[in-house]
Amino acid sequence: MTEQQPIAVLGGGSFGTAIANLLAENGQAVRQWMRDPEQAEAIRTRRENPRYLKGVKVHPGVEPVTDLERTLADCQLIFVALPSSALRKVLQPHQAALTDKLLVSLTKGIEAHTFKLMSEILEEIAPQARIGVISGPNLAREIAEHELTATVVASEDDELCARVQAALHGRTFRVYASRDRFGVELGGALKNVYAIMAGLAAAMDMGENTRSMLITRALAEMTRFAVKLGANPMTFLGLAGVGDLIVTCSSPKSRNYQVGHALGEGLSLEEAVSRMGETAEGVNTLKVLKEKSDEMQVYMPLVAGLHAILFEGRTLAQVIQLLMRGEPKTDVDFIPTTGF
């Protein structure tokens, strides 16, 4: 189904561009907003986003724009692909223009200092808007190159989910729906932390047993933490949980994996992030997740270990020794799903 009005995508990064392309390929008129006029002009003239998605042609139906006020006025369905550190700053001045809009967050991050997810920030800024999120095993370049992909749109608003499914669903991109917005969004944010650890392990040439252990124990940690906050544990067995975790912890295309790999090669955190040239949400998420898990007394040894390496001066060897000598635990915590 084609929307009667143009659809907005806010953000000029790789994921925003990939989603804008999908929408345009499905016959939607798309306005992709970005702050940088030079970037917008490059996309307009070269039909390519050379900074973030080099080599991928931008569909003619995608119009790069820099006038945010007009974009918000012209569009009803708005996909928000802004970094977690910028979302509030960009949208707060346009609060009135967001009333009654359908706002769908694509950002897998947590706001520093508040521990708010992106949809919670959108609710604060635009309490009269209708809110949803998209998350899943979705590497931007693979989406743009038409690899078969599935994602999850989550909202308590069934009509919003249906409209997003109709707008995005295509021959290579399948969209499932969920009502557990909090769990879907939390899964997308948390897995970024473990992707850094997976990249670090790969750079150190650790074995397949080790990598498998990291992914499965990461899933246990994520689920334990999310359930404590009220998420449905079953969400973490789906695309937005284990699906996203596997792809992000296995693929060199993942930004957070790349940061971890650079650290394993001997670069400092600052050098690793700088080499990326694009936001890796996992670094910021790690800081707030460590603080929150300590506050809530949730057992998260992998989070504590990675935090010790990145911010406390511990070596990987020291952390491995502490993890392997830790108190024996059960493999799986059985969590009742009644009430979700």
Curated annotation (Swiss-Prot):
InterPro entries: 6-PGluconate_DH-like_C_sf, 6PGD_dom2, G3P_DH_NAD-dep, G3P_DH_NAD-dep_C, G3P_DH_NAD-dep_N, NAD(P)-bd_dom_sf. NADPH binds at residues 14-15, 35, 108, 140, 255, 281. Disulfide bonds: none annotated. Keywords: Cytoplasm, Lipid biosynthesis, Lipid metabolism, NAD, NADP, Nucleotide-binding, Oxidoreductase, Phospholipid biosynthesis, Phospholipid metabolism. The active site is at residue 191. PROSITE patterns: NAD_G3PDH. It comes from the Bacteria. Its main location: cytoplasm. GO terms for molecular function: glycerol-3-phosphate dehydrogenase [NAD(P)+] activity; NAD binding. One of its GO terms (cellular component) is cytosol. Pfam families: NAD_Gly3P_dh_C, NAD_Gly3P_dh_N. The keyword Flavoprotein does not apply. Belongs to the NAD-dependent glycerol-3-phosphate dehydrogenase family. This is Glycerol-3-phosphate dehydrogenase [NAD(P)+]. It comes from Pseudomonas aeruginosa (strain LESB58).
